[in-house]
């Protein structure tokens, strides 16, 4: 399955790839952004993804753009280390597309989806990540489960859901996404005028916790800012308010010249778009996943 890149035209317009430029696609996925960048200019792309399953998409791009795409299976918080290892000190742009991809959601064996029964995993990487969702729901205390569901999912029934999870695991270990979704639905009903499944926020929260997504995002932006050439850009596409809040705060710190993740980068950044860029109605119609997407971008002066 191919993951349709969101806000692709808007990303390209801002990044404006140049011949001879060096760009980082920090969330490679199926390579949609990388392909667009490589098509736009005679440039180099260094692509990163922690998901081992994305390697096959890299192979296709490598065939189409020989010697211009370079791929690394790692977390994007390691951008600086990855590039240092290949003697790249500065780049002209870094692009992040945050969150879970369509490919990951559609593959039941990955354990991300509450609509497809599969093993309760949710790890973006089976080699780089530690605790999976199964271990979380079966071993973490009721209080912490409730806190995670509330903090990362904004779920107002977090305590009720946590209690139901603990009650269920006391009888039998929770092993599948279907089991977990059923437990949640047994205590939280779908509201009459709302199409969102009652399991949505809880699954999001557990996924964020398992993959340390918000911590990784902070580190990734800080490292990206540290490797930009003058005129270089960071572009972040996020899909929910927790991610967007981190991007907004990090960009403000950079523009204000504040220390970011122990990196004192000094003054020299400015926002490219004062207002959030959102997908058009046409894009949302053709790709409903784009509905909640928000793009923010920053420039190194």
UniProtKB/Swiss-Prot annotation:
One of its GO terms (biological process) is rRNA base methylation. Signal peptide: none annotated. Keywords: Cytoplasm, Methyltransferase, rRNA processing, S-adenosyl-L-methionine, Transferase. It is found in: Cytoplasm. Belongs to the methyltransferase superfamily. RsmH family. PANTHER family: 12S RRNA N4-METHYLCYTIDINE METHYLTRANSFERASE, S-ADENOSYL-METHYLTRANSFERASE MRAW. Specifically methylates the N4 position of cytidine in position 1402 (C1402) of 16S rRNA. NCBIfam families: 16S rRNA (cytosine(1402)-N(4))-methyltransferase RsmH. S-adenosyl-L-methionine binds at residues 31-33, 49, 76, 97, 104. Gene3D superfamilies: Putative methyltransferase TM0872, insert domain, Vaccinia Virus protein VP39. It catalyses: cytidine(1402) in 16S rRNA + S-adenosyl-L-methionine = N(4)-methylcytidine(1402) in 16S rRNA + S-adenosyl-L-homocysteine + H(+). GO terms for cellular component: cytoplasm. Its EC number is 2.1.1.199. This is Ribosomal RNA small subunit methyltransferase H. The keyword Plastid does not apply. Pfam families: Methyltransf_5.
């Amino acid at each position: 399955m191919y993951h349709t890149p969101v806000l692709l035209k808007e990303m390209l317009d801002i990044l404006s790839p140049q011949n001879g430029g060096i760009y980082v696609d920090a969330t490679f996925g199926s390579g949609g952004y990388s392909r667009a960048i490589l098509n736009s200019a005679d440039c180099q792309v260094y692509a990163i993804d922690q998901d081992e399953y994305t390697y096959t998409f890299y192979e296709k791009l490598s065939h189409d753009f020989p010697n211009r795409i370079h791929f690394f299976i790692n977390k994007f918080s390691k951008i600086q280390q990855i590039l240092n290892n290949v003697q790249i000190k500065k780049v002209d742009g870094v692009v992040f597309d945050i969150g879970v991809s369509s490919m990951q959601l559609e593959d039941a064996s990955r354990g991300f989806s509450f609509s497809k029964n599969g093993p309760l995993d949710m790890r973006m990487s089976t080699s780089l990540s530690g605790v999976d969702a199964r271990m979380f729901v079966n071993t973490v205390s009721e209080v912490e489960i409730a806190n995670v569901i509330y903090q990362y999912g904004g779920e107002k029934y977090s305590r009720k859901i946590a209690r139901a999870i603990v009650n269920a695991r006391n009888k039998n270990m929770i092993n599948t996404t279907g089991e977990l979704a059923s437990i949640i639905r047994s205590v939280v009903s779908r509201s009459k005028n709302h199409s969102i499944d009652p399991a949505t926020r809880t699954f999001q929260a557990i996924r964020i916790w398992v993959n340390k997504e918000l911590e990784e995002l902070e580190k990734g932006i800080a490292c990206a800012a540290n490797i930009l050439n003058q005129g270089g850009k960071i572009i972040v596409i996020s899909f929910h308010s927790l991610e967007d809040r981190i991007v907004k705060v990090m960009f403000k710190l950079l523009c204000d010249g504040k220390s970011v993740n122990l990196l004192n980068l000094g003054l020299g950044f400015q926002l490219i778009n004062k207002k959030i860029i959102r997908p058009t109605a046409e894009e949302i119609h053709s790709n409903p996943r784009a509905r909640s997407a928000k793009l923010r971008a920053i420039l190194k002066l």
